[in-house]
Amino acid sequence: MAEAVFRAPKRKRRVYESYESPLPIPFSQDQSPRKEFRIFQAEMISNNVVVRGTEDMEQLYGKGYFGKGILSRSRPNFTISNPKLAARWKGVQTDMPIITSEKYQHRVEWARDFMRRQGHDESTVQKILTDYTEPLEPPYRERKGESPQHEPLSSKADSSLEGREGKDELSVTTGGAGQSDDLQGLNTHSDCRQEGPGHATLTVASPSSLNGHAIEDPEALSQIPCCSQEALGQQDDLWPEASSQIAGESRAAHEYVLIEEELCDVQEGAAPHDELLKRKRLVCRRNPYRIFEYLQLSLEEAFFLAYALGCLSIYYEKEPLTIVKLWQAFTAVQPTFRTTYMAYHYFRSKGWVPKVGLKYGTDLLLYRKGPPFYHASYSVIIELVDDNFEGSLRRPFSWKSLAALSRVSGNVSKELMLCYLIKPSTMTNEDMETPECMRRIQVQEVILSRWVSSRERSDQDEL
């Protein structure tokens, strides 16, 4: 057997973030107050483990790159803001999403359909949506006697706005009276997007998928005839509030958005037959149909955080699950969980960041530091065998299929690794009912490389 040649991980050309920490736990050299050990909260919903706390999501993904956003490719950073509109209105210093009028109307229709399914009549639905989607002032809120602060735009931003086309007038509608205000009052802060404690809201999530579609109803709507807050809260049990409350976070309040709308106005001093000029403005409204993004953990990632690090508590129907129950539940959901987790635990303990290798036909992909910094170095196939290398294979290979998989891995600059988990011949299925069985497991790694005759001849000639 030839000796394996280890290649250095290939760093990505462009890196857009800094490396924080390999794991979401404090290390011995960290003595600052902010480095306290923290228990994160997750829920098991529809055979999936999801994290809903905003700070928990940031910590778990930012430190160790655990999980992925259910609406994003990797980091949970989903936003409904239109990138083209955000670039067009770049002079508006605001953290509120900017969307088109058509996109906002889609959300109004989704909210309308949701309330119809709850049994509301058409007049009640129309009344609720009319009141909820009225134009508002940008959400400056008084906090403990503080007056709202309006920070003007910088001169640089003003000059950039003046250079726009003459037919596009930048304005913002404020107040229910239809008044118009200039853009100098749109510099909002992140804490201005939630109303004060005096505004009660109901958040209802759709059970159809993990994408939390929510409709919010202000307290004033309870005074509308034939409509009560309980009507919008009939499905609260489908998405229990326990996770956000356990995590120490309150329910998200209203989400404010800026909608680009068009106005028609006659040009001053123009002839009657001159065409109308279209002016565009930004209108602040409440989003009637919110979409929440959560962090979804693989079963291996969730169990590693709970068992190996002890920093994750997983709840099912508001009840915390023990380590043994998690081991049994994950095995019932995914029959190959024991095998894949042992390999995941092994590679994580060695400093690699394992991710699902389904894209390249393997079980795991191994990254150095994390996907934002390096390309995956290895594609891993996992097999559980006894000490005689016998047993039922999870994935039997023929020479043809193995050569094809090796060719695929080589074409994407990854090495194919066979990871053999060797258990004693005396170990029974009953012995594997708890994670303590991992103490008796040995691991052997085999790197598979393709022999190329022409390359071998050139190497021999050089020698």
Swiss-Prot record:
Q: Which InterPro entries match?
A: tRNA_endonuc-like_dom_sf, tRNA_intron_Endo_cat-like_sf, tRNA_intron_Endonuc_cat-like, tRNA_intron_Endonuc_N, tRNA_splic, tRNA_splic_SEN2
Instruction: List the GO terms this entry assigns under cellular component, sorted alphabetically.
Output: cytoplasm; nucleolus; tRNA-intron endonuclease complex
- The residues responsible for catalysis, as annotated, are Y367, H375, K414
Give one Pfam family, short name only.
tRNA_int_endo
Annotated region Disordered: where? Answer: 120-213
Species assigned in the record = Rattus norvegicus
Residues modified to Phosphoserine: S32, S147, S406, S409, S413
The gene name reads Tsen2
Q: What's the subunit arrangement here?
A: tRNA splicing endonuclease is a heterotetramer composed of TSEN2, TSEN15, TSEN34/LENG5 and TSEN54. tRNA splicing endonuclease complex also contains proteins of the pre-mRNA 3'-end processing machinery such as CLP1, CPSF1, CPSF4 and CSTF2.
Which GO terms fall under molecular function for this chain's record? lyase activity; nucleic acid binding; tRNA-intron endonuclease activity
**What is the name of this protein?**
tRNA-splicing endonuclease subunit Sen2
